[in-house]
């Protein structure tokens, strides 16, 4: 086919190009330059990485401000929106200010895909994605976390709660824009 096309002219490689020596030297030069580049890895077990507020780690339940229990009102939205169905809730009524709270609240961490849908849909900001990323289990039973393992104080997830408030304010339209649309 090359002989029939008059525009095609095969390029002749010289001796060094046929040996691929220049290309090998270019690769070695790049490798040598990388020896003196700054190190960007951390020595993990000794040095822990501090994730930013945007990071979605293990989901946790947030305590109420008065530390009398969880913020959760057992509405069940998080369990309905969870794609892998990792969350299970059973509600019971209480005599406290809120009418209901979860009698059982479990998250199967083997099923959780850390999507954050449960956090987005929660009306009480009761379930939040924490900054915990080093999650290990000895057996499958330990991977199912109940209320006692999930409950954390507000101070521990305050950075994430502040991020969520800022994020939700950016997503929602200000009231002035909504009133202008109605006119």
From Swiss-Prot:
Q: Which residues are recorded as binding [4Fe-4S] cluster 2? A: 82, 112, 115, 118
Q: What are the record keywords, sorted? A: 4Fe-4S, Cell inner membrane, Cell membrane, Iron, Iron-sulfur, Membrane, Metal-binding, NAD, Quinone, Repeat, Translocase, Ubiquinone
InterPro entries the UniProt entry points to: 4Fe4S_Fe-S-bd, 4Fe4S_Fe_S_CS, NADH_quinone_OxRdtase_chainI
Q: List the GO terms this entry assigns under cellular component, sorted alphabetically.
A: plasma membrane
Q: Its Gene Ontology molecular function terms?
A: 4 iron, 4 sulfur cluster binding; iron ion binding; NADH:ubiquinone reductase (non-electrogenic) activity; quinone binding
The record's comment on cofactor binding reads: Binds 2 [4Fe-4S] clusters per subunit.
* Protein family (similarity comment): Belongs to the complex I 23 kDa subunit family.
Q: What is this protein called?
A: NADH-quinone oxidoreductase subunit I
């Amino acid at each position: 086919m090359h002989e029939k096309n008059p525009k095609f002219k095969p390029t002749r490689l010289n001796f060094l190009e046929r040996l691929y020596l220049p290309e090998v030297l270019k690769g070695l030069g790049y490798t040598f330059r990388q020896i003196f580049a700054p190190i960007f890895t951390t020595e993990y077990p000794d040095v822990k990485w501090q994730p930013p507020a945007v990071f979605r780690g293990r989901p946790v339940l947030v305590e109420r401000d008065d530390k009398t229990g969880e913020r959760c009102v057992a509405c069940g939205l998080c369990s309905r929106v969870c794609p892998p169905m990792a969350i299970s809730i059973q509600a019971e009524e209480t005599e406290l200010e809120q009418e209901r709270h979860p009698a059982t609240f479990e998250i199967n961490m083997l099923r959780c895909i850390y999507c954050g849908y449960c956090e987005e849909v929660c009306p009480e900001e009761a379930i939040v994605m924490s900054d915990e990323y080093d999650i290990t289990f000895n057996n499958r039973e330990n991977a199912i976390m109940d209320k006692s393992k999930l409950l954390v104080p507000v101070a521990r997830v305050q950075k994430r709660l502040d991020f969520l408030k800022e994020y939700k304010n950016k997503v929602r339209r200000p009231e002035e824009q909504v009133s202008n649309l109605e006119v």
